[in-house]
């Protein structure tokens, strides 16, 4: 189906869905409607089962930013947003809400706020991590909001509009005395889990190569989702999980009163030891969308909605002062 035709159908379907939800008194879904002018009310932290403090944030359409949109997106009135949360989600970044259908989390909520500034209906498309990028490559997805790290390798295919610091954390059982203080030598002889295709995997495998050159090693284990990772930690199949700091902080808080409490055993920049990592909205390279997305994020930063969003999800310590387009990211060779 031609892209323009598909967008038109998506816009019509999204409008119909929003009208139905409003008539029933519903609160959200995988489509968030915005108006081409005026103000949109976005409920941040909805259906989060206590992971966030629910707050309604008003977002006006900014005509000067909307005018920068690629014509096919502006005319269709829909922003197709990609999320890489399948199969089990990743609280607090993104997961299925308490109604068992609505996608909630810090990442979809920011996408909804950006859509409000741009005067676009936000259509959330959830996929596996790998298929998130397939969607962007194919044009089915306009932009990814899914804790995507700015890396130089990814810049070969994508443009980035940054919106949060990228910090990684090492999760262990609370009973473990292992700690990471910046020296990868501490990983020797440990069993470590990480997600495939991520910047943290790249960093971890480079550390492993350096240790192997010294005659040392550690095991790298992969699991299909975060639930399996937590079970592996609790059963002793792994010693350490390396993942996004917000997710580790969430697991530590959730497990505090459980039989197997967890703790954060240290953090590391998602861009390596010489650069502060950054999380970014991700568009197909040279699509023309990255600048209006960055400008929309900067509008939210300058007018306080960004701070409300971070506060609702307890991510204030990962705030950035400005959204940048394609700043330096994790080097292709992190040496």
Predicted regions and their residues:
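Bilobed "Venus flytrap"/periplasmic-binding protein-like clamshell domains
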Residues: 88, 101-117, 148-150, 167-225, ...
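Extended ligand-binding regions for polar small-molecule ligands
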Residues: 38-63, 111, 116, 176, ...
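A ligand-binding cleft/hinge motif common to bilobed small-molecule-binding domains
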Residues: 148-155, 204-206, 210, 239-275, ...
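C-terminal motif of bacterial Sec signal peptides marking the signal peptidase cleavage site
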Residues: 19-23
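Extracytoplasmic small-molecule ligand-binding "clamshell" domains
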Residues: 35-144
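Periplasmic-binding protein-like
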Residues: 165-172, 256-295, 316-335
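Acidic, polar ligand-binding/catalytic clefts
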Residues: 121-186
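Bacterial signal peptide processing site
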Residues: 25-28
């Amino acid at each position: 189906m031609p892209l323009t035709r598909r967008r038109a159908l998506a816009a019509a379907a999204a409008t119909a869905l929003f009208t139905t939800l409003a008539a029933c008194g519903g609160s959200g879904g995988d489509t968030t409607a915005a108006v081409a002018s005026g103000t949109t009310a976005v409920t941040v932290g909805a259906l989060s089962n206590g992971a966030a403090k629910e707050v309604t944030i008003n977002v006006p359409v900014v005509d000067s930013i909307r005018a920068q949109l690629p014509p096919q997106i502006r005319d269709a009135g829909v922003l197709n947003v990609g999320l890489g949360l399948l199969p089990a989600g990743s609280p607090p970044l993104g997961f299925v809400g308490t109604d068992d259908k609505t996608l909630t989390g810090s990442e979809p909520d920011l996408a909804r706020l950006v859509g409000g500034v741009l005067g676009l209906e936000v259509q959330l498309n959830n996929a596996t991590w790998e298929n998130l990028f397939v969607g962007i490559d194919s044009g089915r997805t306009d932009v990814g909001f899914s804790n995507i790290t700015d890396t130089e390798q990814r810049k070969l295919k994508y443009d980035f509009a940054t919106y949060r610091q990228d910090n990684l954390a090492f999760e262990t059982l609370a009973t473990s005395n292992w700690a990471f203080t910046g020296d990868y030598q501490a990983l020797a002889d440990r069993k470590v889990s990480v997600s495939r295709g991520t910047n943290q995997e790249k960093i971890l495998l480079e550390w492993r190569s350096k240790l192997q050159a010294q005659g040392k090693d550690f095991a790298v284990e992969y699991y299909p989702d975060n639930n399996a990772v937590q079970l592996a930690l609790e059963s002793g199949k792994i010693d350490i999980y390396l993942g996004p700091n917000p997710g580790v902080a969430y697991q530590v808080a959730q497990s505090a009163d459980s039989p197997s409490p967890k703790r954060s055993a240290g953090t590391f920049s998602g861009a390596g030891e010489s650069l502060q990592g950054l999380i970014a909205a991700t568009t197909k390279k040279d699509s023309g969308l990255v600048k209006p997305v960055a400008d929309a994020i900067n509008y939210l930063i300058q007018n306080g909605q960004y701070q409300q969003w971070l506060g609702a999800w307890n991510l204030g310590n990962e705030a950035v002062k400005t959204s940048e387009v394609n700043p330096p990211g994790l080097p292709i060779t992190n040496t």
